[in-house]
C-alpha cells in the first residue's frame, strides 16, 4: 500500500479555448498561406487524445503554471529535461563513430529546457495512461498503482546507475528487436525510397499503398541552404570532420535536390518547416550521396508559456546542444543553422533509427514494459546531469502520490480540452483545408 503524501491543491487551469492557445503558440512560426502548415497541425491534433497530448504541450505547461507551483519553485530540482518524452520520442538513433552505428535513448529535442525533473516524471505517467486508453487496455486500481510504481522504481534504479540507456536496456527484447531491425538496412535503401530516376526527390512517398510524405521541390533555395550547411559545419567541428570539404562553393556544387517535407503522421512539429537536401558524396570515406535533414525549431513549449525564461541560444542551437548533452553516445550528425531568420536543427536522413510504437503496447504486461523503458531512459539521462545526489532524496512515496494525483487531474483536463477542440468550428474548417491540400498531392 502506498503511503499518501502531501498533494497540492489542483486548480482549474482551462484556457478560454484550446484552439486559441494553440494558434497563439504555433501560427506565428508557420507560413500563413500554406495549407500544409497550420491546417495540418490542427488536423493532426484533432485525430485522437494521444496525438492531442503529443502535439499540444502548450496546454500542459499552461496547466503546470497553476498546478505544479511547488515543483516550479524547487529551483535545485531544475535540470535539462527532454520536455516532451512520449513513447515516440524514445528510440534508436544514428550514433557517433562508424557510419551506421546505433544507440538507444531520447530523440527529438524540440521542447527541451531546464525544468524540474518532476515534470518529466509526470509526463511519463500521463503518456503511459493515455497509451492504455488509446489501446483500450482497462486498468484496475491495483494496476494503476503497479504502473506508476514500475515507472518510479526503474527511474530510481537508472538514476542510481553508472550506465547509459543503451547498456541498461541491452537485454530488453523490445529494444534488441528494434536495434536488430535497424541494422538490417543499407543507406542505399533510403536513397531508393526518396530519389527518383532523374536524381531528384520524389514528390511523395507511400507506405503499404497509403500516402506517407509529401515532398515539394525547393531547388530554387540552393544558395540559401548551401550557406546554411556551411554554417552548420562551422558550429560543429565533429560534423565538419566528416565532410570532404566545408567550402561554400563545394557545398553549393554538391547540392543535387531540395524538397520541403510534410510527414502525414507527425504531431508535435507538424506544420513547421522541414527540408531534405540531397548532397553528392559529401562525406570522407563514404561513396554515397547523403540526405541532410533540416528541421525548423521554435522556442520550447515551456518558454512559450513563460514557465521558464527564453533561452539565450537560438532554438536550433538549444536543440542541438541539448541533444549532445542528453545522449550517450552522441549522435552521428548534429548541428544547427539559421536560414532567412528561421532557426533549424541539422541532422541527416537515414534508415537505421526508429522510435517506440505505442501500438505495440497491447496489454498490461507490455504497458509495464513500456514503463520500464521510459523510466530507464529518463533516469539514465537525468543522471548524466550529475544531479543524482539531488534527485534520489526527492524520490519519496509522497512524490509518487503527487504524480499519481496530478496525472488524474491533467488527464481530466486534457479530455475536456480535446472535446472542446474537436467541437470548435475553426478546427473543422482547417481540417477541410488540410484534407484538400493533401488530396491535391496524392498520386504525384
PLM feature spans:
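Bacterial N-terminal signal peptides
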Residues: 1-9
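Acidic catalytic cores of enzymes that act on phosphate-bearing nucleotides/polynucleotides
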Residues: 188-267, 278
